Amino acid sequence: MSDHRNDYEAECDYKAGCGNEAGCDYKAGCGNEAGRGNETGRRTGRRRKVTIVIPNYNGLKFMEPCFKALSMQICRDFDILVVDNGSTDGSVEWLKEQEIPAIFLPENTGFSGAVNVGLKAAATPYVILLNNDTEPDFHYVGEMIKAIERSPKIFSVSCKMIQLFRKELMDDAGDMYSLLGWAYQRGVGRSSAKYNRACRIFSACAGAAIYRREVFDEIGYFDEMHFAYLEDLDVGYRARIAGYDNIYCPTAMVYHVGSGTSGSKYNPLPAASSMKLVLSKAKFF
């Protein structure tokens, strides 16, 4: 089966930012390695580098392992903001009980609607969009910050997303777009050992990606006509048109359950219809 390799994967010059560097100094990339992210920021009055925006819709069962993994991050230079999409499973009560910063929406606005609210509420230079059904590796936040700070022309960084229950398999290594017009997840279902090289990609998978926040003011936010799928391909494409890069960083790893944030009830708009929306905006050179 073809790997659909193309020029994006062959020309990356950001490898120094997301390779397997020995003796990596996280202080240079994050600035704060002690204490809980939100609490430490409030104590010092120092603005954090990144806000982790977590969209949630009836995902209470995923909350505890996700937040436990975030609490164990080596890099602490982040705030957390949950955007709840009108959950009815006890998520609202749990978030309030845990005193986790959150915005509570009255109804389900879809993935794009929720993350747009979070992006506009964030005051940090970078924003990580993170599905609730993920468990980030200890080094995840630090590696993502280091990667995006390698160049002001990097709009987004996609992590190495691995299947939680089959860790030998990839879930996503960035999104690609073939010459035949098909969008696809790079690496899905393949050996996770084969995706250890940094490269350019067409767009980052928004389930666990970091973005340069100010660029959204230039290119626009996630298109809310994409209720749950292909919204990341669309925004990544707009960034490329504006002259920015999207890259894959293999040293930033996240373990993903799958369909936690979205799922069939959360996705009334078929992916094929979403693809038509992307193509309707396409510019061919």
Language model features with spans:
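Glycine-rich, basic loop-to-helix element that forms the pyrophosphate-binding segment
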Residues: L105-A122, N132, E143
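Conserved donor NDP-sugar-binding/catalytic core segment of glycosyltransferases
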Residues: T134-S178
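Short, acidic, metal-binding catalytic loop of nucleotide-sugar glycosyltransferases
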Residues: K68-D77
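A short, conserved alpha-helix in the catalytic core of glycosyltransferases
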Residues: F202-M253
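A conserved acidic beta->alpha catalytic loop
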Residues: A69, D84-V92, E107
